[in-house]
Amino acid sequence: MERTFVYLKPNAVRRGLVGEIIKRFEQRGIKIVALKLLWMSKQQAEKLYEMHKGKSFYNDLIDFVTGGPIVAMIVEAPRVIEMVRHIIGDTDPLKAGTGTIRGEFALTITKNLIHASDSKENFEREYKIFFSDDEIIDYYLDVQDDI
């Protein structure tokens, strides 16, 4: 099984889309193994987005993601990184496909509702910003019989 880090940005929480987004993952057999509601600190945001430091959008992005509560989670399934990226759609909502989370609900590139790790290496770096290993719960999901 593969794992990835996902977080729902403040606008997803404020717009009441948390349940809808989680439902889309669960309907695809994706198992949530860690989940928390929190207010991202500036330090966490700067660490998460360190590769964008110095870019024109960096300060606005940091202000946005620290401006309200987020839902952070670790999810698990075979090929989950690829699957989650497909479900959420392109970073730019105008390029995100119909039926994707960003294609249906996102308004701008920065305020695109959701972040997901794009590689195993980034998952390993990103989840540790928000979770300790003892917060990850391993359990059996009935849908695993169908995988």
Curated annotation (Swiss-Prot):
Gene Ontology MF terms: ATP binding; metal ion binding; nucleoside diphosphate kinase activity
Cofactor(s) the protein needs: Mg(2+)
Oligomeric and partner information: Homotetramer.
The keyword Iron-sulfur appears for this protein: no
Gene that specifies this protein: ndk
EC numbers: 2.7.4.6
Chain residues that bind ATP: K9, F57, R85, T91, R102, N112
Active site per the UniProt annotation: H115 (pros-phosphohistidine intermediate)
Localization per record: Cytoplasm
UniProt-listed Gene3D superfamilies: Nucleoside diphosphate kinase-like domain
Gene Ontology cellular component list: cytoplasm
PANTHER family xrefs: NUCLEOSIDE DIPHOSPHATE KINASE (PTHR11349)
Name this polypeptide is given: Nucleoside diphosphate kinase
Any matching Pfam family: NDK
Transmembrane portions of the chain: none
GO biological process: CTP biosynthetic process; GTP biosynthetic process; UTP biosynthetic process
Family: Belongs to the NDK family.
Function: Major role in the synthesis of nucleoside triphosphates other than ATP. The ATP gamma phosphate is transferred to the NDP beta phosphate via a ping-pong mechanism, using a phosphorylated active-site intermediate.
Native source organism of the sequence: Thermosipho africanus (strain TCF52B)
